[in-house]
Amino acid sequence: IKTKLSHEDAFSKYLIGQGAKINKPYGWQIKILSPESFLRKIGPVLEKRLTESKFRGLTRMLKMNFWKYELGLWFEDGKLVKVEQTSDAGRILGMNPYATIQLFLGFRSREDLEYAYPDFYVRDGLGELIDVLFPRKPGYIHYCY
């Protein structure tokens, strides 16, 4: 019997406790076509994570360099007020476009990605902030094939 459930839900944990086998999830084949739109959409989640951290009330702009373009995330008093492309050259957050999807979706941590991808980097002591905004979390993508 295949359950097609996350390994983190209560029922799956029960089945595992009864001796069920865990299959590795199939590789993620996800592409975020517009990181700008995606980050706007998850803005309330990012704001909640800030509120529950030492970064409550954050006011600053984060520049994410995606090789061909940069995105600026403007936070004011802990609220994400603007996400848009910027032309300013910045090399503080180097976002490998392929690896960043794993960060945004919680599949890999910032440290995992910095280790695996030399062109994924977080400088100027922003690692902890990125960890708060994009923590590693269990997830499951249901696929229908």
Residue ranges and their predicted role:
Residues 1-145:
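Intrinsically disordered, low-complexity, positively biased terminal segments
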